[in-house]
Amino acid sequence: MAGSISGIDWVSRMPVSGVYTAVAGDDSADKAEINTGMANATGAIVQIVQSGVVVGADAKPSLAAGVLTVADGSTYKVTAGDVINWIVF
């Protein structure tokens, strides 16, 4: 039988994921802000689907204090209806 894990808070390091659909307010703010609920997250993976097509262009994702921000780039613009799939860890 395996022993217990002590000294490691492994549950708080489990990835959290979700799907966010951009709204008109995100469009006018030039960014979508997603509260992931994981304040200690240090990394993120983001996939954006716009009009049924995966956007691989220059969206600008950033992560601070559990809030994932996807901002406009030089060619990508956050648009109401964009589907943002995300994982933070």
Predicted regions and their residues:
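Extracellular receptor-binding modules and their adjoining Ser/Thr/Gly/Asp/Asn-rich linkers
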Residues: M1-E33, M38, T75-F89
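A generic structural signal for beta-strand entry/edge sites
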Residues: A29-K31, A65-T69
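Short, hydrophobic/aromatic-rich segments at coil-to-beta transitions
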Residues: P15-V19, T42-A44, A64-V67
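Extracellular/luminal ectodomains and secreted, surface-exposed scaffolds of diverse proteins
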Residues: Q50-V67
